[in-house]
């Protein structure tokens, strides 16, 4: 299970994401330049140069034609995946924290930070005929977030809803057509939600939180189904597309990290059984907290991005597929 070490960023990784086929792996970091890699051998195919601040989020559409990024330079950009050119750049009033394409690829959503006297806002834009004039057009929908800022986001089924995770541990579902909240979970986490990822069929999602837990939720009712407990903040969590497995990654805040933390196993990727909530494996590798995790769409490998600036792609041994959890 020898990993691929992808070294192309000068600062810590903020998010990693596979495209639908899994042949491309996209990574964003605080060094202003998102990268795209060939996931099979770790070759860097290119960079997307244009942001002037830390890039906090990215997403690639269903056909791997467009890439959306959000950054601390108060812009969200739409890119041509193949040529690396900027299709459109949209200015915002504060940093862009999350961005996602809808399943159809017709729309994209992004949210801004609660900072500099500005409230957090959720925006939805139409990207079907996106060009440079997109920055001058009004968004399809704008929803102000009065209570707590959005820290993670996913589209619901049929592009009808958006699921948001918040800084206060709250989760909500919003109707895209009406711009109204339709389901509110209350405060499910005792601290902020760092990450949220859907299962392959979109019926469930897993959240990663600063309260040292990851939780599995029903995507329609927001009922909490399972809880995976650790001893330190969880920065990211992902659900395997082929097994009932969840992988968790995290660690202390970067400012609290010491050299002894690596030896203590604080930066391992931790595997839990989806149903039994039991940890069954750990994988070492990063020299700092893990900030983002993603399973390959075929379930035979996974990738992790860390505070150390490395992206690691781990392929599973044959024993992983042979050993059935009992």
Swiss-Prot record:
Coiled coil: none annotated. The keyword Metal-binding does not apply. InterPro entries: eIF3i, WD40/YVTN_repeat-like_dom_sf, WD40_repeat_CS, WD40_repeat_dom_sf, WD40_rpt. GO terms for cellular component: eukaryotic 43S preinitiation complex; eukaryotic 48S preinitiation complex; eukaryotic translation initiation factor 3 complex, eIF3m. Its main location: cytoplasm. It is found in: Cytoplasm. One of its GO terms (molecular function) is RNA binding. Component of the eukaryotic translation initiation factor 3 (eIF-3) complex, which is involved in protein synthesis of a specialized repertoire of mRNAs and, together with other initiation factors, stimulates binding of mRNA and methionyl-tRNAi to the 40S ribosome. The eIF-3 complex specifically targets and initiates translation of a subset of mRNAs involved in cell proliferation. Component of the eukaryotic translation initiation factor 3 (eIF-3) complex. The eIF-3 complex interacts with pix. This is Eukaryotic translation initiation factor 3 subunit I.
């Amino acid at each position: 299970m020898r990993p691929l070490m992808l070294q192309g960023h000068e600062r810590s990784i903020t998010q990693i994401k596979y495209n639908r086929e899994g042949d491309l792996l996209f990574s964003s970091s605080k060094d202003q330049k998102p990268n795209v890699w060939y996931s099979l051998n770790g070759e860097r195919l290119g960079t997307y140069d244009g942001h002037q601040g830390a890039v906090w989020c990215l997403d690639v559409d269903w056909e791997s034609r467009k890439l959306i990024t959000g950054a601390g330079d108060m812009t969200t950009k739409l890119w041509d995946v193949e040529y690396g050119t900027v299709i459109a750049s949209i200015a915002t009033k504060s940093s862009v924290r999350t961005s996602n394409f809808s399943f159809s690829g017709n729309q994209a959503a992004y949210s801004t930070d609660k900072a500099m006297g500005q409230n957090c806002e959720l925006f939805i834009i139409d990207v079907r005929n996106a060009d440079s004039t997109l920055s001058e057009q009004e968004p399809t929908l704008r929803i102000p977030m009065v209570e707590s800022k959005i820290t993670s986001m996913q589209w619901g089924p049929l592009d009808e809803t958006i699921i948001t995770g918040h800084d206060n541990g709250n989760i909500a579902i919003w109707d895209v057509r009406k711009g109204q909240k339709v389901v509110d979970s209350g405060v499910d986490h005792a601290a902020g939600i760092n990450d949220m990822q859907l299962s392959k069929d979109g019926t469930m999602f897993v959240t990663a939180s600063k309260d040292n837990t990851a939780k599995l939720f029903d995507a329609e009712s927001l009922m909490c189904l399972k809880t995976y407990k650790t001893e330190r903040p969880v920065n990211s969590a992902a659900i395997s597309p082929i097994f009932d497995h969840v992988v968790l990654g995290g660690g202390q805040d970067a400012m609290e990290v010491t050299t002894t933390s690596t030896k203590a196993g604080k930066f391992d990727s931790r595997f839990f059984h989806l149903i039994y909530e039991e940890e069954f494996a750990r994988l070492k590798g990063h020299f700092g907290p893990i900030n983002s995790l993603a399973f390959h769409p075929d379930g035979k490998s996974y990738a992790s991005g860390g505070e150390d600036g490395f992206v690691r792609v781990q392929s599973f041994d044959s024993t992983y597929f042979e050993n059935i959890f009992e």
